[in-house]
Design a protein with these regions (language model features):
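N-terminal amphipathic/basic helix or basic patch
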Residues: 3, 13-17
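Vicinal oxygen chelate
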Residues: 3-7, 31-32, 38-41, 46-53, ...
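Short, surface-exposed ligand-recognition loops at beta-strand->loop->(often short) alpha-helix junctions
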Residues: 10-14, 70-73
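Short, conserved charged micro-motifs
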Residues: 16-19, 74-79
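N-terminal first-folded block
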Residues: 16-35
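Short amphipathic alpha-helices in soluble, non-transmembrane regions
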Residues: 23-24, 79-85
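Phosphate-centric recognition/catalysis
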Residues: 67
């Protein structure tokens, strides 16, 4: 017997703000919204649904889990695009011939933008 991921859930203060940000960042569609939550789905059916659930407390420590996002073009282009949507750069990492940018969404949740094909990244076959 095994488990499969059904939904990726974000605790947040404002579900609509995060749903709007992640919808624009990932190209996901808004599936629903109510007073306590918003949810998105990947129109291609490949990605997990995202649920944004209101909680009373704010974020106070580093995420224990985060998203690593691979751009279709370059890391620099994607970092600039998500910055325009409301993300901020937390730090840039260059370790052992790997590099990525750690970013924060509008509520401070960490995510990483990795190298893309224009940066020399090649998918493993």
């Amino acid at each position: 017997m095994s488990l499969s991921v059904d939904t990726l859930t974000f605790d947040c203060r404002d579900p609509r703000v995060l749903a709007d940000f992640w919808s624009a960042a990932l190209g996901y569609e808004l599936q629903g919204i109510d007073e306590e939550s918003s949810w998105l789905r990947d129109p291609t059916g490949r990605g997990w649904p995202l649920l944004f659930l209101i909680v009373p407390e704010g974020k106070s420590v580093k995420n224990r889990v985060h998203l690593d996002l691979r751009p279709e073009t370059s890391m620099a282009d994607e970092v600039a695009r998500v910055q325009a949507l409301g993300a901020t750069i937390f730090r840039r990492v260059d370790e052992n011939e790997s590099f990525w940018t750690v970013m924060l969404d509008p509520e401070g949740n960490e995510f990483c933008v990795l190298r893309g094909p224009e940066d020399g990244w090649v998918a493993a076959e």
